[in-house]
From Swiss-Prot:
It comes from the Bacteria. This is Methylmalonyl-CoA decarboxylase subunit delta. The lineage of its organism: Bacteria, Bacillati, Bacillota, Negativicutes, Veillonellales. One of its GO terms (biological process) is sodium ion export across plasma membrane. Subunit of the sodium ion pump methylmalonyl-CoA decarboxylase, which converts the chemical energy of a decarboxylation reaction into an electrochemical gradient of Na(+) ions across the cytoplasmic membrane, thereby creating a sodium ion motive force that is used for ATP synthesis. The delta subunit is required for catalytic activity as well as for the proper assembly of the individual subunits to an enzyme complex. Can also convert malonyl-CoA into acetyl-CoA. The chain crosses the membrane at residues 11-31. Residues 46-70 are annotated as: Disordered. Its EC number is 7.2.4.3. InterPro entries: Na_pump_deCOase. Residues 48-65 have a biased composition (Low complexity). It catalyses: (S)-methylmalonyl-CoA + Na(+)(in) + H(+)(out) = propanoyl-CoA + Na(+)(out) + CO2. The N-terminus is blocked. GO terms for molecular function: sodium ion transmembrane transporter activity.
Length: 115
């Protein structure tokens, strides 16, 4: 093998190997960015709809017919408000349900006639 220059320096071999590895990683990163830019499955951005400011109605003290229903509406409104604050729209919320039903919730449902 007199025609080929062979090195036995481990530092040079390490530098060449690491250069190849990082060059491939950079190439993969660029390829991922290109695919991200031309992704045909990505939803198109819709123009933001101009929303008119909603006038807040004045609060009128009315005795609720069912305190449980009002409490449930307030809880749902608080959950929807928290989700909307995180960046989701109210149209994206499919349902609100507890992750695990406890004995207290089951009893509440039976006593209020929903179970």
């Amino acid at each position: 093998m007199e025609g080929q220059a062979v090195t036995t320096n481990p530092w040079l071999i390490m530098a060449i190997n690491m250069t190849v590895v990082f060059a491939v990683l950079i190439a993969l990163g660029i390829l991922m960015e290109i695919v991200h830019l031309i992704d045909p499955t990505k939803k198109k951005k819709e123009a933001p709809a101009a929303t008119a400011p909603v006038a807040t109605p004045t609060a009128t003290p009315v005795a609720p017919a069912n305190a449980s229903a009002q409490n449930e509406d307030e809880v749902v409104a608080a959950i929807v408000g928290a989700i909307v604050a995180m960046g989701y729209s109210s149209e994206q919320i499919a349902s609100i349900r507890p992750t695990a039903t406890s004995a207290k919730w089951r009893l509440e449902g039976r006593l209020s006639g929903r179970g």
